[in-house]
Amino acid sequence: SMQLTFGDAEGLGKRKQTRREIFLSEMEKVVPWKQLLALIAPHYPVSGRPGRQPYALATMLRIHLLQQWYALSDPAMEEALHEIPTLRRFAQIGGLDDIPDETTILNFRRLLETHGFAARMLEAVNAHLARKGQSLRSGTIVDATLIAAPSSTKNADHARDPEMHQTKKGNQYYFGMKAHIGVDDVSGLVHHVECTAANVADITQAHKLLHGKEDTLSGDSGYTGLEKRAEMARKRKLRYLIAEKPSKLKQVKNARELQWTKRWEHAKASLRAKVEHPFRVIKRQFGYVKVRYRGLAKNTAQVLTLFALSNLCMKRKQLLPVVAEMCL
């Protein structure tokens, strides 16, 4: 059981809850802890051997999730646990002597990567949400976003990561990775994620972002011509709602036809807006703006984890037990 220090105990109950405390208490209730722990438990070292006992699996998983929510590196996570009682309480850490060091935190992430935990976590979260009535429906929206990578790294030769690439968007060059997602057009939940180098065209990944039961596929004008591609021919019959390129709109001369076309484009755009929400959560709320690791595999694992957590975060209000308003 967790012991509270006098300082912790004094702080509790008297003051206003901080945003961090409110967020973590909500996450405490909506994360499917039992299912996630069951995925890792078979691979986690068990206590009972001589020497130092491993940290509780629940503590290590909680620390791993805290790193995603607050964009903390391993050393920054260790420091934050020393400095912030709220994070210690969430991680179920008793005293300051029980805080895992940065190497232990790193090794736990390596263990998760080795066993492909991130992809299974996204599946487990979505299965959990489906049981709560947030299931995938008949349409998928596809989109991609750029995640910048550092243009030099701290390795010996200061070279750029060979698995990242440069791409041009507008008049700017970006170096890094691209995250492609498939999102349910009713619930807004992310169900498929692919990460590639930044110079890979969005359209080439679209076929990997479908769950296979959808009737409609929406995307921006970067997906123009998707229905003609060979890899889509093998998919079930889909209704494609792809945005027109602005240059196409300029070619419409008939005023009535132009008005109708603009209205139709607006309708498609308002449907596509759902795909922006998960990107906003991971970038703005979780602060994920830069690639953290070297190579695509490690970064893909992090992005999968972030989208599993953004799904929970976006649906937390529906998942939280309705608290009866107290009549004072």
Predicted regions and their residues:
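Alpha-helical support elements that line or immediately flank enzyme active sites
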Residues: 59-71
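Amphipathic, well-packed alpha-helical segments that form the structural scaffold of globular domains
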Residues: 37-45, 126, 279, 283
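Helix-centered, glycine/charged polyanion-binding patches within enzymatic domains
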Residues: 7-10, 215-216, 221-301
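Charged, often Cys/His-bearing segments associated with DNA-binding zinc-finger transcription factors
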Residues: 1-34, 38, 321-328
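N-terminal core-binding DNA-recognition domain of tyrosine recombinases/integrases
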Residues: 48, 71, 112-113
